[in-house]
């Protein structure tokens, strides 16, 4: 379900309310400040595990959860029936409504969009964030995609 909401005239910062299907992410936690563009080895560790166990065809999505400035969970949704291996963990997110901004371009553009989402859109929306971390949903791999073609959803889970 998608409903556009009033927002800035810049279509790159249009906020929509979507219903996010349940996610079960096998994630590896990055500890220490790190720009998104440098998280490749963290995502790569999960991908290597998936490849060595024949799970790459099960990938439903690529996700990141910025927990705070020094902790980031990077991983993949393989569906609900896999267990996390040693050194990784499961992140389960129930079905929820989210405020979504779809971003096109370099990851450096995410910070201004987050500032708008939290500082501009959220206060005027009448909504409150749920007790679930912000979610990054990545649509392509920065190792083989030009920066200008990167697509990332910023998903802010909302209280019902």
Predicted regions and their residues:
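A solvent-exposed interaction/effector surface
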Residues: 1-160
């Amino acid at each position: 379900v998608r409903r556009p909401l009033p927002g800035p005239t810049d279509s790159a910062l249009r906020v929509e309310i979507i219903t996010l299907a349940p996610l079960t992410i096998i994630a590896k936690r990055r500890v220490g400040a790190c720009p998104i563009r440098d998280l490749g080895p963290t995502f790569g560790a999960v991908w290597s595990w998936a490849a060595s166990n024949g799970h790459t065809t099960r990938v439903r999505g690529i996700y990141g959860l910025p927990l705070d400035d020094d902790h980031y969970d990077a991983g993949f949704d393989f569906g609900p029936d896999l267990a996390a291996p040693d050194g990784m963990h499961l992140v389960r997110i129930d079905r929820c409504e989210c405020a979504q901004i779809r971003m096109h371009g370099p990851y450096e553009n995410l910070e201004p969009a987050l500032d708008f989402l939290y500082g501009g859109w959220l206060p005027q929306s009448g909504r409150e964030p749920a007790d679930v971390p912000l979610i990054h949903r990545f649509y392509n791999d920065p190792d083989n995609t030009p920066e200008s073609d990167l697509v990332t959803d910023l998903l802010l889970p909302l209280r019902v």
